[in-house]
């Protein structure tokens, strides 16, 4: 059984400015997006320019941050933020919903593709394999903060971990690291392999929805359930409710993409 290391949430300070690990992980996510995106541009010459990729990242950042925070407020902690409205703006403290951020990115990509007169699905297919490692970085930030810990685990589990922030000092699943392994590393490998060959339009986007939704549904069984807008449930969590439509829509997109290709 392990004890959570209890990292200082501040990675480093420069004068009065403190840089937190959680914010630093977002920076890592954005940097890897640019690095992998530029590599993919070379494999698809003429599709996007480096300048367009940088602009795409800017729109994506706005979508992630605004959508992620609003998703946290609306899906998971509406009562808390209603009582403490100024906390909505304290994004450096953590508290970002993936599903809210995902919806924010969809809107941002819609605006960006309209601005550049590009097909929305083709851009989303390009972006899909660039996302998982960024998600992994965010989950590493959750682990460093000692938040979003897992459900109580058997003390005999070698990697069971005590998170002092939970208040009960019981051994728990380090579910943040499960997210890193499945929704981050595994999904990245799958999508990078899947997009190595030309695929029908919307197939890669659909594969992302299926992969993320399925992996998130699995990892939620090891994560301490959030209360969410429907209250706390040990049968199916808010994250699982939000992942189900992702899986269904993803399957429909992949089926439609390949059927359209065969017509």
UniProtKB/Swiss-Prot annotation:
Task: Report one GO cellular component.
Answer: plasma membrane
Taken from the record, one Pfam family name reads LGT
InterPro entries, per this entry? Answer: Lgt (IPR001640)
Name the residues that bind a 1,2-diacyl-sn-glycero-3-phospho-(1'-sn-glycerol): 139
Enzyme Commission number(s): 2.5.1.145
Q: Does the keyword Transferase apply?
A: yes
Q: Which keywords label this protein? A: Cell inner membrane, Cell membrane, Membrane, Transferase, Transmembrane, Transmembrane helix
**What is this entry's stated membrane topology?**
Multi-pass membrane protein
What does the sequence similarity comment in the record state about its family?
Belongs to the Lgt family.
Xref: NCBIfam families: lgt
Q: What is this protein called?
A: Phosphatidylglycerol--prolipoprotein diacylglyceryl transferase
């Amino acid at each position: 059984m392990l004890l959570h290391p209890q990292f200082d949430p501040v990675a480093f300070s420069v004068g009065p400015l403190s840089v937190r690990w959680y914010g630093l992980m977002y920076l890592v996510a954005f940097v890897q997006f640019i690095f992998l995106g530029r590599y993919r541009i070379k494999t698809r010459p003429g599709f996007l320019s480096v300048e367009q990729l940088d602009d795409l990242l800017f729109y994506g950042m706005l979508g992630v941050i605004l959508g992620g925070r609003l998703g946290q407020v609306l899906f998971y902690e509406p009562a808390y933020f209603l009582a403490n409205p100024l906390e909505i703006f304290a994004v450096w403290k953590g508290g970002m919903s993936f599903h809210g951020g995902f919806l924010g990115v969809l809107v941002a990509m819609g605006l960006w593709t309209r601005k550049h007169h590009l097909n929305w699905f083709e851009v989303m297919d390009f972006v899909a394999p660039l996302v998982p490692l960024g998600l992994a970085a965010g989950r590493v930030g959750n682990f460093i903060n000692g938040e979003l810990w897992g459900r109580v685990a058997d003390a005999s589990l070698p990697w069971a971990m005590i998170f002092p922030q939970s208040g009960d000092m019981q051994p728990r699943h380090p579910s943040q690291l499960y997210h890193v392994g499945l929704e981050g590393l595994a999904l990245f490998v799958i999508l990078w392999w899947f997009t190595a060959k030309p695929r029908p339009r919307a197939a890669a986007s659909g594969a992302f929805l299926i992969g993320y939704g399925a992996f998130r549904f699995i990892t939620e069984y090891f994560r301490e359930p959030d209360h969410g807008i429907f209250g706390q449930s040990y049968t199916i969590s808010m994250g699982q409710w939000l992942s189900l439509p992702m899986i269904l829509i993803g399957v429909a997109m992949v089926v439609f993409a390949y059927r359209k290709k065969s017509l």
